[in-house]
Amino acid sequence: MSWEPDTLTKYCRPEMFEELAAARPKLKICLAHFGWPWCRETAMLMLKYTNVYTDTGALYFDNAKEFYTQMLTRDVPMTWIDRSLRHQVMFGSNNPRFEQIRMAHAIKELGFRESTLDLICGENAIEFLGGIPNRKA
């Protein structure tokens, strides 16, 4: 979702990127902010297209842990990320708008497996940017 005043929200829906993801399977696409508030739509696209990624730099209101608990355990069940989407989620903080340290601590406190945290907190970004591929089982 864009906070730009002249940007229509209808063009921010993750589903608007499906044709591109399907037509260009080698093009890596990052749907920013987990597609908030359409997080499940983002997850659906990530399940369907391995070239679709997202980041955790979503808007939160005062408390990063409470927001991530809602977004990454209820809106999108944590098991979906831990089991199926772990190679497509990258840490993001929207710095300087929000404090990345608080956001990183909140992500780490949710209860993801250590290997999933390693992917989210760095390895996936390296792979996304053309570094060493990490598509492990």
Where do the PLM segments sit?
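Catalytic pocket-lining loop regions of alpha/beta-barrel enzymes
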Residues: M1-M90
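Mid-to-C-terminal alpha-helical segments outside catalytic/metal-binding sites
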Residues: L85-Q88, F98-A137
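Detector for Asparagine
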Residues: N51, N63, N94-N95, N124, ...
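Conserved, mostly hydrophobic/aromatic
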Residues: H33, T54, N94, L117, ...
